[in-house]
From Swiss-Prot:
GO terms under cellular component: endoplasmic reticulum membrane; plasma membrane
UniProt subunit comment: Component of a P4-ATPase flippase complex which consists of a catalytic alpha subunit ATP10A and an accessory beta subunit TMEM30A.
Binding site for Mg(2+): D319, D323
Gene name in the database record: ATP10D
Residue ranges that the UniProt entry lists as topological domain Exoplasmic loop: 397-407, 481-487, 538-555
Residues the entry annotates as binding ATP: 14, 56, 80, 124, 204-206, 259-266, 293, 299, 322-323
MF term (GO), any: magnesium ion binding
Keywords: ATP-binding, Cell membrane, Endoplasmic reticulum, Lipid transport, Magnesium, Membrane, Metal-binding, Nucleotide-binding, Translocase, Transmembrane, Transmembrane helix, Transport
One Pfam family here: PhoLip_ATPase_C
Entry EC number(s): 7.6.2.1
Name by which UniProt lists this protein: Phospholipid-transporting ATPase VD
Function: Catalytic component of a P4-ATPase flippase complex, which catalyzes the hydrolysis of ATP coupled to the transport of glucosylceramide (GlcCer) from the outer to the inner leaflet of the plasma membrane.
Location relative to the cell: Cell membrane; Endoplasmic reticulum membrane
Length: 653
């Protein structure tokens, strides 16, 4: 029957302990709020009466359960928690003492060796201890604890004091080590984020040895990491001295990665206002920062400190309840769903099933999101400047009277209906670089960090282009119809039509990933414009007296001059943009063809911009790993972008 038992626990650690106990013939049979039944191989099933439970909290870093032993009828307190906390709560034992004290000292020393060995293996460690109480002692404690629970003022402090009175003078029972395996793809994701220029801090509640082992396992720290260690008693003056002595620990251009490892006690002083600046100066010289034995409050304080003082965008990712405060404080919070529960997911902005998906979320979707927003904002500026300036140029010919050469309903629907959907589709579906390329070249993510898609000169060039197109869109029809007897709306109709074609075709030129959805929306916008103009022109007899747009579109669709004006205006307005984009693509194709030809002939070609970028990636990767010969090989054989990138890939191994 025991083999068919299935346990549900609050955390994987709890379940692992129960399953391990069952493997040693100590099987949990049932659990109710009042009692626990355990089946022992030697004595059979025993029922323990549950008297009280002190749940885990991040301040105490432990939990306790009070039971009545079924054989001795004694009140026993069992406590498990972090080894650094439990060891301080043990009863004082002297190596020169009597039998029990000496035995306890031997157990403590042996357990400490086991803990150190577990930590070096990357296991999550816990210590387990117990305390036997008399009924009188327990009744006295329970009465005071009840007063603390019912207190209105300082309730949290009173409960903490009550727990401290119970959890002291403990007898050590032993320690446990639970394997916490890295998920698939974690080292590769960490390495990709490093290449993308993202600085990673590891905030964990594990002990230092475990945290360092995990940091090495997930490539957060490389094998060439230069370790700078200094012992300290965690006093503020000594922390300040340590910061001054180690700044800068490693020159940033030395090719080595400097890492900072700091424990929770030292971090408590480093987060003090007088030391915050020095602490951040020290971390600025380190590519990796590992904060171990950190409480949930300290995690959130570190995120607040980095976010407020360094003025950077922060992202926090976690999978447990201890990470909730950190996730909520960061600019972007990501929760990893899994066995740790759903608290982190519920508190996050985004949720992923595994850590490895973070690299695609940032490098691919983050890059796309940035370029889409940047390009869409630029396009909205361009669209409005290009169209509104038509009214501006017209004011020079109407005495700045404020009149318009088109009906106000057309002006309203031009932005509201005819040209609103294409920019949205552009901002949702645009992909300037394929997902495969972004994953293979994490360095491309740096373009978003440097705001290369929305630089000041890009903005002003876009506005100048919009001014030029508005000039062409206005004056080509103006000089075409100059001297004719057309009215104001007959003159404005070619302007609106040409402006629509120019704005939509400009979007096609700028888009790098046209789909059938783009073409469907653009075609629908054009058809809706002509349909509205025809219906509105047929119905609007007295819309805007004394002149009215009555039957204007119907007459123009039969006039060859109208088509000639629209086509000529569109071509002249978009010619500079088309030539600029075409020249850029032609230059890229020519560079690729030259590289391929030189690659076949065995000559080293003159690298283009893309090739230089790929070479720099290979060079920086080679230097980062300390392999200068590989760096030289990447430079000597960098015939093309693909070749240079392939030379860089071995750096990853």
């Amino acid at each position: 029957m025991a083999c068919n038992l299935c346990y549900e626990a609050e955390s994987p650690d709890e379940a692992a302990l129960v399953y391990a106990a069952r493997a040693y013939q100590c099987t949990l049979q049932s659990r109710t709020p009042e009692q626990v039944m355990v089946d022992f191989a030697a004595s059979g099933p025993l029922t323990f009466q549950l008297l009280h439970i002190l749940p885990f909290d991040s301040v105490r870093k432990r939990m306790s359960v009070v039971v009545r032993h079924p054989l001795s009828n004694q009140v026993v307190v069992y406590t498990k928690g972090a080894d650094s906390v439990i060891m301080e709560l043990l009863s004082v034992a002297s190596p020169d003492g009597a039998g029990p004290e000496k035995q306890q000292m031997i157990i403590r020393e042996k357990t400490q060796r086991h803990l150190d060995d577990y930590a070096k293996q990357g296991l999550r460690t816990l210590c387990i201890a117990k305390k036997v109480m008399s009924d009188t002692e327990y009744a006295e404690w329970l009465r005071n604890h009840f007063l603390a629970e019912t207190s209105i003022d300082n309730r949290e402090e009173l409960l903490l004091e009550s727990a401290m009175r119970l959890e002291n003078k403990l007898t050590l029972l032993g320690a446990t080590g639970i394997e916490d395996r890295l998920q698939e793809g974690v080292p590769e994701s960490i390495e990709a984020l490093h290449k993308a220029g993202i600085k990673i801090w590891m905030l964990t509640g594990d002990k230092q040895e475990t945290a360092v082992n995990i940091a090495y396992a997930c490539m957060l720290m490389s094998t060439i990491l230069k370790e700078l260690q200094k012992k300290t008693q965690a006093l503020p003056e000594q922390v300040s001295l340590s910061v001054d002595l180690h700044q800068p620990p490693v020159p940033q251009d030395s090719g080595l990665r400097a890492g900072l490892i700091i424990t929770g006690k030292t971090l408590e002083f480093a987060l003090q206002e007088s030391l915050q600046k020095q602490f951040l100066e020290l971390t600025s010289w380190c590519q990796t920062v590992v904060c171990c034995r950190a409480t949930p409050l300290q995690k959130s304080e570190v995120v607040k400190l980095v976010r407020s003082h360094l003025q950077v965008m922060t992202l926090a990712i976690g999978d447990g309840a201890n990470d909730v405060s950190m996730i909520q404080v960061a600019d972007i919070g990501i929760g990893v769903s899994g066995q740790e529960g759903m608290q982190a997911v519920m508190a996050s902005d985004f949720a992923v099933s595994q850590f490895k998906h973070l690299s695609k979320l940032l490098l691919v979707h983050g890059h796309w999101c940035y370029t889409r927003l940047s390009n869409m904002i630029l396009y909205f500026f361009y669209k409005n400047v290009a169209y509104v300036n038509l009214l501006f140029w017209y004011q020079f010919f109407c005495g700045f009277s404020g009149t318009s050469m088109t009906d106000y309903w057309v002006l309203i629907f031009f932005n509201l209906l005819f040209t609103s959907a294409p920019p949205v589709i552009y901002g949702v579906l645009e992909k300037d670089v394929s997902a495969e390329t972004l994953m293979q070249l994490p360095e491309l993510y740096k373009s978003g960090q440097k705001s290369e898609a929305y630089l000041p000169h890009t903005f002003w060039i876009t506005l100048l282009d919009a001014f030029y197109q508005s000039l062409v869109c206005f004056f080509v029809p103006y000089f075409t119809y100059q001297g004719s007897d057309i009215d104001i709306f007959a003159f404005g109709n070619p302007l609106n039509t040409a402006a629509l074609f120019i704005i939509l075709l400009h979007l096609i030129i700028e888009s790098k990933s046209l789909t059938w959805i783009h073409m469907l929306v653009i075609t629908g916008s054009i058809l809706s414009y002509f349909l509205f103009a025809i219906v509105f022109g047929a119905m609007c007899v007295t819309c805007n007296p004394p002149s009215n747009p009555y039957w204007i579109m119907q007459e123009h669709v039969l006039d060859p001059v109208f088509y000639l004006v629209c086509i000529l205006t569109t071509c002249i307005a978009l010619l500079p943009r088309f030539v600029y984009r075409g020249a850029g693509k032609m230059n890229q194709v020519t560079s690729n063809y030259a590289n391929q030809s030189a690659d076949k002939s065995g000559r080293r070609p003159k690298p283009g911009p893309s090739t230089v970028f790929a070479m720099k990636s290979a060079t920086s990767c080679a230097i980062e790993q300390g392999n200068l010969s590989l760096c030289e090989t990447a430079l000597d054989q960098g015939y093309s972008e693909t070749k240079a990138f392939e030379m860089a890939r071995p750096c990853k191994d």
